[in-house]
Amino acid sequence: MSESPFIFRGKRNYVLAADVLDAVLFDFYGSSKTRDLDYLVKYPCTTQGYRLLERASATQLEEMQAMAQLRDENHNVLVMPAGNPVTERCDCTETGMAAYFTYDRQNPEKPIVHVSQLLTETPFSRTCVAAFKYLLNTCVVQEPRQYLFARLRLKTTDISCFSIQFQRIFGKTFFEGSILIQGQPCGQIFFGGKTA
């Protein structure tokens, strides 16, 4: 089991699943860099720690209880909640991150947010999630929404500058974006969202 300093950031808890992903990757590799990543958030994290189970040996009940599942070039695991509930909340660093975001609205149907660099000590996953939320709020959605980070698929997480292009909305509550490196597709990000 890993006890990590998970805390809620800002008023919403949507970014915590990205912090869990970065923590798991750091436990595996000593950094958040990997390849062929598919990370699916099954429900929001509410605990200060997690434990990992190999999916191949997991029971059906454990599959249902997992807060996320992660597959990459070396692992296929369930991320299980563990430890005490998260009780601490801090200011969100989104405002500082936004200084590194620029928008391209040339195609109003599929606007793009460009991220020029990762903030110091801000992992890729959290930056990616914050950038997609900013894109949705700035260029796509006209009403206040509560978002939940739902899925991240990437060929590589060894990324410092990237873009996210809005792709589509499913059923008015599910949002898809394409992650681009130098204009070439590298992955996808998905959010769930409901009217605030």
Which residues are covered by each model-predicted region?
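Hydrophobic beta-strand-centered segment that forms part of the acyl-chain substrate-binding groove
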Residues: L25-L61, A66-A68, V129-R168, K172, ...
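HotDog/MaoC-like acyl-thioester-processing domains
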Residues: C45-F101, Q167-A196
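Generic serine detector
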Residues: S2-S4, S31-S32, S57, P111, ...
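Short amphipathic alpha-helical face segments that pack within enzyme cores
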Residues: D19-F26, E121-A130
